[in-house]
């Protein structure tokens, strides 16, 4: 069974399907689970909780999806959570520069590389727009954070790109109120949001998606004392 067969079966049986599909302006990268899909997702989460969270006596939280600007300034997301993009001067189509280069020249450039490196390869390999063959502009960085405005004062905030942020900022309170001691594991299941340049392959690269995440806090000077640490 290939990818197209899986997609056809999923849509026919209502496992999952595009969000807002009855309207012509629906955006890519947003999918919804039907009844069967929800059942499968819930079974996975129950297994995850049973085999990891409850077995190792971890704490589970449910943090906010919208968080303050300060959180992401401290984490570095506002400055570094970005992908290299390049736009066609003719048809204005936008592409991920690293993927376009890999698809057309089979040259792999890490997305963290300097922008000048992308521009150089595009010029040397005479890479053009894959849609209209037009000339490409200079490569730029595109931040994938979803910005939102809070209240009538329009205070700047962001949808979280990962579930770990709540775990980190809530750790001091959790450690105190739960009378924790190191090592301690904190888990969270919830939605994250990334303004992907080119969401694709249905559930594999989304702009809104679920994450099940665990962070383990420990004393770095006592790693050898941790049970099963050598198995990680």
Where in the sequence are the language-model features?
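TRNA-recognition modules of translation machinery and tRNA-sensing kinases, especially anticodon-binding
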Residues: 2-232
């Amino acid at each position: 069974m290939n990818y197209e067969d899986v997609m056809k079966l999923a849509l026919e049986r209502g496992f999952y399907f595009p969000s807002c599909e009855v309207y012509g302006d629906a955006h890519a990268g947003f999918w919804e689970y039907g009844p069967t899909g929800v059942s499968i997702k819930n079974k996975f989460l129950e297994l995850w909780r049973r085999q990891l969270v409850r077995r190792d006596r971890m704490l589970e939280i449910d943090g906010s999806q919208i968080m303050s600007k300060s959180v992401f300034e401290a984490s570095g997301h506002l400055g570094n959570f970005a992908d290299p993009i390049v736009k066609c001067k003719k048809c204005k189509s936008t592409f991920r520069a690293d993927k376009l280069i890999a698809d057309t020249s089979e040259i792999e450039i890490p997305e963290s590389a300097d922008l000048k490196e992308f521009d150089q390869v595009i010029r040397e390999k005479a890479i053009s727009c894959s849609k209209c063959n037009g000339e490409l502009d200079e490569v730029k960085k595109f931040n994938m954070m979803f910005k939102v405005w809070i209240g009538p004062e329009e205070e700047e905030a962001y949808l979280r790109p990962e579930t770990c942020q709540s775990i980190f900022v809530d750790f001091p309170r959790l450690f105190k109120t739960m009378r924790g001691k190191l090592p301690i594991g904190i888990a969270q299941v919830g939605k994250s949001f990334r303004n992907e340049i080119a969401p694709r392959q249905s559930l594999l690269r989304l702009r809104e998606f679920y994450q099940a995440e665990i962070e383990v806090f420990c004393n770095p000077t006592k790693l050898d004392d941790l049970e099963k640490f050598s198995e990680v």
